[in-house]
């Protein structure tokens, strides 16, 4: 029975990898979106700390799982910059680019907001992050199944 469960898990991992355009070994299953956000942010922050980088960029418009984790990281000495969100719920790649400093270790923004319908320019933000050598996380819970998610093309490091 354990072998069958392992095979099903591997099959699910391969299916998700095809959907997201990543390698199966890059898929980690969690109990849900909040745990995934927490794990991604805490892991990226720890990597940043090891490199002497303790600045994170996000927005005040994020899910509480992200905002609460950012608050906890601030208590650990991280600096968090919350970008202003336009009236339409958008944040531009230019805003992200202007906020990046040599100390920035992570950018985390919501892919889509289900309350107002905004879909952020994830590929452009991801490109800015990739060019700056900054990890990029997006909470895509509300986007999954509605818009294409391609972690390679959109330069997403953590999802």
Annotate each predicted stretch with a short phrase.
Residues 1-159:
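Pyridoxal 5′-phosphate
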């Amino acid at each position: 029975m354990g072998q069958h469960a392992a095979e099903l898990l591997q099959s699910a991992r391969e299916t998700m990898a095809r959907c997201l355009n990543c390698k199966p070994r890059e898929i980690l299953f969690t109990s849900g979106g909040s745990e995934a956000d927490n794990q991604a942010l805490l892991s990226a922050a720890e990597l940043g700390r090891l490199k002497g980088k303790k600045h994170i960029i996000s927005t005040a418009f994020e899910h509480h799982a992200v905002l609460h984790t950012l608050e906890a990281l601030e208590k650990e000495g991280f600096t968090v910059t919350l970008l202003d969100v336009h009236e339409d719920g958008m944040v531009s790649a230019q805003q992200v680019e202007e906020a990046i400093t040599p100390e920035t270790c992570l950018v985390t923004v919501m892919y889509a907001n289900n309350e107002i319908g905004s879909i952020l320019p994830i590929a452009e933000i991801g490109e800015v992050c990739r060019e700056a050598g900054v990890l990029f996380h997006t909470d895509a819970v509300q986007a999954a199944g509605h818009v294409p998610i391609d972690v390679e093309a959109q330069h997403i490091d953590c999802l």
